[in-house]
């Protein structure tokens, strides 16, 4: 038996509407309670001046294993997650082979158990091999531990396939995660279609490519009663549609990334591949709409969309380099810089979008400091300044758009199942 007392921190738990200075007591791998009166423990952590919250959860992470271990492994990716303050991640099925059957899902869980850094919840494929033609073995994947279904960066373009997927996954109480882009409108596109795409002579991706797919998916969610989760929003039009869908009580949730909040399409002026992402960086008008969506609850979650690539892949020309950036180790400080320091969100609202909201979408018993729940805790130092240096990342990927940024705040201590697994 082991006990831990986290003393004197600002405890922020949106699941219980708690935001106050206090003590958190852990017994073995469970939370005993807040302000239990305990003053001694086997381990005491002084959290004065820090924020103590449920372990952060990232529901959009690509770990690359099996198949692309040169880009990332489960071990390096989960180590990066811990360094970023995450105690749980949901991993995309975009591996080789694709996680479209029970054996593949069980392999991912086995490898994650061996790595032993943080909790990993596998997402299964919607269609076999992500080809959009035939549904994957949904029932078998649920038995193999899949908490949701997605074809990752491959949008489910066929409306009939998506309809059947929503109907089927509803039976198992699982969400469908879709990348809301119309493939015909995004093919060979490099950046947001607008002033800078014309100035730079680069093929653009119109905002309408996202807006059209969001509208279709909302309509299918209404038709089927299924749960659609719309990944990595980037446009004002998508936010408007989701706001209306939520007002109607539809089962629609959504997410946004820190890089879509912090950067605009103007960043591509130097043809730097670490600003090439999918969906593309857009204009300030779209960013303002995304932030308002976070403020009013239209957007439920902030996720990293962690997309690690070996350095040589990102050294290609802009048109041939893969789209995507790493984000596990920069998510928290960029959120602090763009949302907390600017006054757009309170700490409680930000932490909700990183804890209880993703846990609720995934249907996992995480994201809370309630007594009896798993002792997954993130202790945040909100004030320490540091410079983002990709050479120090735990991730094998160095492809960040934030290299050299001066930021404040980072994960100070990360506890998984009652054990300290990371300490800055």
Predicted region positions:
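Metal-associated gating/positioning segment near the N- to mid-region
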Residues: 48-115
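His/Asp/Glu-enriched, well-ordered alpha-helical/loop segment
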Residues: 199-227, 274, 295-296, 300-302, ...
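C-terminal cap of metal-dependent C-N hydrolases
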Residues: 317-320, 374-424
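Divalent metal-coordination and catalytic microenvironments
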Residues: 9, 24, 29, 49, ...
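N-terminal metal-binding scaffold of metallo-dependent hydrolase/deaminase domains
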Residues: 1-39
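Active-site metal-binding motif and surrounding structural segment of the metallo-beta-lactamase
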Residues: 37-52
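Histidine/acidic residue-rich metal-binding segments in metalloenzymes
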Residues: 133-302
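Alpha-helix-loop-beta-strand connector modules within alpha/beta enzyme cores
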Residues: 102-119, 167-178, 330
